[in-house]
């Protein structure tokens, strides 16, 4: 699947319902007040940015449940997760993670650079996800001509532990529901797309 990994959904930025999740981090009421103000100001700045003719959609998640917030956004596939704590605020920076990269791959970036580069970052993510999907498709597509070749390809070599053929087969079809039912019964193969 091209829009998911072991951690959850991976949404291309152009189709994501929201683009950025801001997660303020604080330990006291005093920190909360200043970090929340910084976070809300950053959210307003980001919402003024246009991404492919629509304003950026920004979520502020101020739940006080630590790492659960981050994993919630990873599973939901939000393109960019941003953590903001007192140190980030003092340095006028943010701690950013991209959903197209491993979840531990996070970087500190200045607030101004982040706001200025967010459309570029999202476009780079869009391109990376498309190229990854295209490479998967090309690397997992086999062309099959003829019924015998089709059955040979999908018949398990070892019926005790049948191999999984994940991917795509470009094959001819006789346009008969009976033919499709027979292939499904014999090989557990189903038609996904008919041009």
What role is predicted for each listed range?
Residues 1-195:
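NTP/phosphate- and nucleic-acid-binding module
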